[in-house]
Amino acid sequence: MFITFEGIDGSGKSTQIQLLAQYLEKRGKKVILKREPGGTETGEKIRKILLEEEVTPKAELFLFLASRNLLVTEIKQYLSEGYAVLLDRYTDSSVAYQGFGRNLGKEIVEELNDFATDGLIPDLTFYIDVDVETALKRKGELNRFEKREFLERVREGYLVLAREHPERIVVLDGKRSIEEIHRDVVREVKRRWKLDV
């Protein structure tokens, strides 16, 4: 079970991934929770660079890809050991943020993602959709990833991906309550994996 959570900052994805991890663990599932960028020792160093330093859009993409490649090795191992792997951001983030947000192009980012991940695709992705205004209010601050026009392009990128991959990407209305969104997440996970819990 490989599940990713996507959305612009302030969408509530990090809250939902924690709630799903708790839900699965209470029911005896082995769960590993990771985030991007980061998730490995070197990946966390890359995360620090991305969050604290100004880099070009292409350099930003390659740093994300390097972090992702390191993490995929661990993810494959966890999956082979029967863990449910829950990941806060993955390839869809690069397509949305770098492909659409930074205008590097959807196709090139998808090709590079495929190369960096050896083609590892999540079984299920939850995209928590909120409008940019709501997300910015929730965050209460702007960093360089969160300029309004940029986030509008990112959001559009996510919506394009959701339309292209409806079998994998479930769009959830992020304006609803945390509990309502969690119920939908659990319902979908139970449906996909025929869980009786």
From Swiss-Prot:
<dbReference type="GO" id="GO:0005829">
    <property type="term" value="C:cytosol"/>
</dbReference>
<dbReference type="InterPro" id="IPR018095">
    <property type="entry name" value="Thymidylate_kin_CS"/>
</dbReference>
<dbReference type="GO" id="GO:0006227">
    <property type="term" value="P:dUDP biosynthetic process"/>
</dbReference>
<dbReference type="GO" id="GO:0004798">
    <property type="term" value="F:dTMP kinase activity"/>
</dbReference>
<dbReference type="GO" id="GO:0006235">
    <property type="term" value="P:dTTP biosynthetic process"/>
</dbReference>
<dbReference type="GO" id="GO:0005737">
    <property type="term" value="C:cytoplasm"/>
</dbReference>
<protein>
    <recommendedName>
        <fullName>Thymidylate kinase</fullName>
        <ecNumber>2.7.4.9</ecNumber>
    </recommendedName>
</protein>
<comment type="similarity">
    <text>Belongs to the thymidylate kinase family.</text>
</comment>
<dbReference type="GO" id="GO:0005524">
    <property type="term" value="F:ATP binding"/>
</dbReference>
<comment type="function">
    <text>Phosphorylation of dTMP to form dTDP in both de novo and salvage pathways of dTTP synthesis.</text>
</comment>
<dbReference type="InterPro" id="IPR039430">
    <property type="entry name" value="Thymidylate_kin-like_dom"/>
</dbReference>
<keyword id="KW-0547">Nucleotide-binding</keyword>
<dbReference type="Pfam" id="PF02223">
    <property type="entry name" value="Thymidylate_kin"/>
</dbReference>
<keyword id="KW-0808">Transferase</keyword>
<keyword id="KW-0545">Nucleotide biosynthesis</keyword>
<dbReference type="InterPro" id="IPR027417">
    <property type="entry name" value="P-loop_NTPase"/>
</dbReference>
<keyword id="KW-0067">ATP-binding</keyword>
<dbReference type="GO" id="GO:0006233">
    <property type="term" value="P:dTDP biosynthetic process"/>
</dbReference>
<feature type="binding site">
    <location>
        <begin position="7"/>
        <end position="14"/>
    </location>
    <ligand>
        <name>ATP</name>
    </ligand>
</feature>
<dbReference type="InterPro" id="IPR018094">
    <property type="entry name" value="Thymidylate_kinase"/>
</dbReference>
<keyword id="KW-0418">Kinase</keyword>
